[in-house]
Amino acid sequence: METVLTARDLTRHYEVSRGLFKGHAQVRALNGVSFELEAGKTLAVVGESGCGKSTLARALTLIEEPTSGSLKIAGQEVKGASKDQRRQLRRDVQMVFQNPYASLNPRQKIGDQLAEPLLINTALSREERREKVQQMMRQVGLRPEHYQRYPHMFSGGQRQRIALARAMMLQPKVLVADEPTSALDVSIQAQVLNLFMDLQQQFRTAYVFISHNLAVVRHVADDVLVMYLGRPAEMGPADKLYENPLHPYTRALLSATPAIHPDPTKPKIRIQGELPNPLHPPEGCAFHKRCPYATERCRSEVPELRLLDQRQVACHHAEQFLG
């Protein structure tokens, strides 16, 4: 199967002022993220706020340049790409944002907003653009006669359908969805998720699905990447990870996810405190101050990602969770 997105040791660091006469500090928002994504597959990226999910999204969509590492889109290395090549790469990777209303122009009719990618990137006539836009509107569950309406005339779920339609107009190879359902009512979330999956099946688009909701992720993901303070904590097939997570942080996230039929035999794992200050990350494992299983080794030695039970995990004591 075709690999459409490859990241190798992707990092993004920011220089932050510490105040007058104190110089600058470095925030490692993204630190050594690697993965491969095939056409028609979904990689879910999960973690708490501040773990680097949105920074990864901005790097993948070329909104920001990574500090180091390699990023390939459809086999094309981003670093060193020419202006024309970058233009094509941006066509190949599109994004759906968390707040659909904020990503739409309130003064422009949605038909014109959906046609804009075609106007910029193709030589289609006005009538051909209109026809393609109305066809896409039908595919996302919107009525073509709403072509002349403005964003404020639609519900939240309809606006997210509009945002998704706009992202799919150029039939990208990769779609990055940053919390696409978190601003929607629960009753609408399932409809939008099913629409994502229908379009993926039709166009064989690869998804990078960013979310903090593991119940939603379970519905859509083929593979899951769990991040903590900019680093991968655990990554592997979704069924394996949900069946038996091997990193204490993943176990805690799943333990906190509401379930219709909870398993009383599984102990509840509660993590204390907040994410550490990224300006002053802890020594050793970044999670050790909140981890109920931490040992002296965790406080002094950074765990490397290693292969264990068909997934990668960054924990010194992951073997104790095998079973």
From Swiss-Prot:
CDD domains: ABC_NikE_OppD_transporters. Keywords: ATP-binding, Cell inner membrane, Cell membrane, Membrane, Nucleotide-binding, Peptide transport, Protein transport, Translocase, Transport. It comes from the Bacteria. One of its GO terms (biological process) is peptide transport. It holds the Pfam family oligo_HPY. Its main location: membrane. ATP binds at G47, E48, S49, G50, C51, G52, K53, S54. It is a peripheral membrane protein. InterPro entries: AAA+_ATPase (IPR003593), ABC_transp_ATP-bind (IPR050319), ABC_transporter-like_ATP-bd (IPR003439), ABC_transporter-like_CS (IPR017871), Oligopep_ABC_C (IPR013563), P-loop_NTPase (IPR027417). One of its GO terms (molecular function) is ATP binding. One of its GO terms (cellular component) is plasma membrane. It is found in: Cell inner membrane. The complex is composed of two ATP-binding proteins (DppD and DppF), two transmembrane proteins (DppB and DppC) and a solute-binding protein (DppA1-A5). Five orthologous SBPs (DppA1-A5) are present in P.aeruginosa, which increases the substrate specificity of the DppBCDF transporter. This is Di/tripeptide transport ATP-binding protein DppF. It comes from Pseudomonas aeruginosa (strain UCBPP-PA14).
